[in-house]
């Protein structure tokens, strides 16, 4: 009986490690395919955006979350439900701007960077930039334009990984004339 109970945890750990290693292989290949880190960063953001655009449907179906009424509620859903659901972590929400339109997600441990060390010749690589694109793409699908960027990264010697999110504007549905 105890053997069965341990397998579920072991399986999740294996899946997590496989995901981390596969992501590492993807970033390595992008570094070979593109001449500089800025191009790799753009490509990771673009790939993340495309994932986010599709992932939001799965998230909404699985989480049963309704429409968020403000950016603070959106931050809570992202940190407490989305990150937990897809990465198995719960980042803390800090550094709210006075206007309530900007905050930071602090990741004590970023599962994407397990087993990773940045080479010296890739000092401007934003290794986990895929996450910024995922957040931007998913939020755009629920009519929120946001700016998302890394401001701290444990791979670059910082004590935590910090993702800064800024609300830009609500996107209005542009329906063709005569349709509602």
UniProtKB/Swiss-Prot annotation:
**Per the similarity annotation, which family is this?**
Belongs to the TRAPP small subunits family. BET3 subfamily.
For this UniProt record, the keywords arranged alphabetically read as follows:
Endoplasmic reticulum, ER-Golgi transport, Golgi apparatus, Lipoprotein, Palmitate, Transport
Q: Which InterPro entries match?
A: Bet3 (IPR016721), NO_sig/Golgi_transp_ligand-bd (IPR024096), TRAPP_component (IPR007194)
Q: What gene makes this protein? A: TRAPPC3
Q: Which organism is it from?
A: Gallus gallus
GO cellular component term, pick one: cis-Golgi network membrane
User: Sorted alphabetically, which SUPFAM superfamilies does this protein's record hold?
Assistant: Ligand-binding domain in the NO signalling and Golgi transport
What function does the entry list? May play a role in vesicular transport from endoplasmic reticulum to Golgi.
**Per its record, how is this protein called by name?**
Trafficking protein particle complex subunit 3
| UniProt cross-references to Gene3D superfamilies, sorted A to Z | Trafficking protein particle complex subunit 3
Localized where? Golgi apparatus, cis-Golgi network; Endoplasmic reticulum
- GO terms under biological process: endoplasmic reticulum to Golgi vesicle-mediated transport; intra-Golgi vesicle-mediated transport
* Lipid addition sites, S-palmitoyl cysteine: 68
Q: Which domain of life is it from?
A: Eukaryota
């Amino acid at each position: 009986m105890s053997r069965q109970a341990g397998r579920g945890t072991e399986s999740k750990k294996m899946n997590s490690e496989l995901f981390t290693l596969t992501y590492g292989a993807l970033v390595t290949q992008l570094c070979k395919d593109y001449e500089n880190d800025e191009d790799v960063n753009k490509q990771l953001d673009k790939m993340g955006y495309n994932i986010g655009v599709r992932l939001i449907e799965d998230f909404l179906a699985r989480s049963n979350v309704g429409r968020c009424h403000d950016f603070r509620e959106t931050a809570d859903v992202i940190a407490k439900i989305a990150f937990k659901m897809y990465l198995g972590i719960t980042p803390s929400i800090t550094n709210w701007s006075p206007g309530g339109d900007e905050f930071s997600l602090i990741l004590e441990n970023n599962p994407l960077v397990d087993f990773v060390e940045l080479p010296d010749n890739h000092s401007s690589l934003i290794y986990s930039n895929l996450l910024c694109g995922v957040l931007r793409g998913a939020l755009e699908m629920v009519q929120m334009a946001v700016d998302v960027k890394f401001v701290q990264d444990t791979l670059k010697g910082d004590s935590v990984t910090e993702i800064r999110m800024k609300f830009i504007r609500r996107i209005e549905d542009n329906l063709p004339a005569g349709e509602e």
